[in-house]
Amino acid sequence: MQMIVAIVKPNKVEAVRAALVGLGILGMTAMECKGYAQQLGHNERYRGPKLDAGFVPKALLMVCVKDTDAERALAAIAQAAHTGNVGDGKVFVLGVDQAMRIRTGERDDAAL
């Protein structure tokens, strides 16, 4: 199993969700967060002077998939979140050793 962690623009969350649902990947956790990378936050002007706003609003998405679905999910997330502008986000893929559905006790792929 693989845990895909995607950091995307907040306005792309629904597009990413729809892309994953289209692949039959039905579970996802989404959190609001703030961050910065190459863009080093963003700058704003207030009555003339430029102010550094620091962090940029982002959405952190987590989805656990079967090994066989990981590459398709990664491609779908990248396509759905892409604008071509700085700040589109990043995707990380991490190995998952075990998973368990608490309600039923199902394990690993069956828990997804």
Question: What does each model-found stretch correspond to?
Answer:
Residues 1-112:
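Positively charged, small/polar-rich N-terminal and surface patches that mediate targeting and assembly
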